[in-house]
Amino acid sequence: MRLYYASVSDFAKIVLPEAEGYEDSRIISKGNILLKHGKSLKAVDVYLDQGSLSEKVTGSAKRWKQMSELSFQLTGMTPRNLGFLSQTGNSGLVFFVSDSNGRVWVLGNLRNAAYLTSGDATSGKKFEEDNMVNFTFSANTGLYEYAGSIAEIGEEAEKKQVGGFSRGFSKGFRI
């Protein structure tokens, strides 16, 4: 299974729904996620049998808060996988996860990014055991469904300088 992600600082916008209805309050409209110019989503292939995406409600009466969690494993204790563990350790990320029903779930947003809460690598104690790198990312927000596809998440247009006063307007004027 392939997960897509980007640093929260790579996004130009992620517009969360403002609807009141149950379903509509959790669907991000197509076109409401945009990367900054020159940025793109990265992908990582995860071990299919051991991944999960969940949402929990924690707290006490009148103090409930939502928390979402993504757990997955990468096969092999390799320099690439260990590098992914160390590079994402303190970075705020936004993940895009396709489920078996064809929905694209969004974990994290501009206000509440997903952070690594648990990560460990093991070579396995016995020869037959898998060597894996385990990850758990959490965000203090609910999960949102993206109404578009992952391929439709584009980047903002390059900002061009327009007009005669875009550069050097303080030079060359005589009064």
Model regions: which residues?
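Short acidic, glycine/tyrosine-flanked loop/strand segments centered on an H-E-D-like triad
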Residues: 71-74, 100-120
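Short, acidic/charged, Gly/Pro-enriched secondary-structure junctions
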Residues: 83-108
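Mixed-charge, glycine-accented linear interaction segment located at domain edges/termini
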Residues: 112-175
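Short, conserved charged micro-motifs
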Residues: 79-86, 146-148
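Oligomerization/assembly interface segments of phage tail-like spikes and tubes
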Residues: 58-80, 129-143
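Short, hydrophobic/proline-enriched secondary-structure or compact coil segments at domain edges
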Residues: 3-6, 70-73, 91-100
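Solvent-exposed edge beta-strands and adjacent loop segments
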Residues: 1-69, 113-127
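A general structural signal for short secondary-structure junctions and capping/turn motifs
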Residues: 61-62, 85-87, 96-97, 125-129
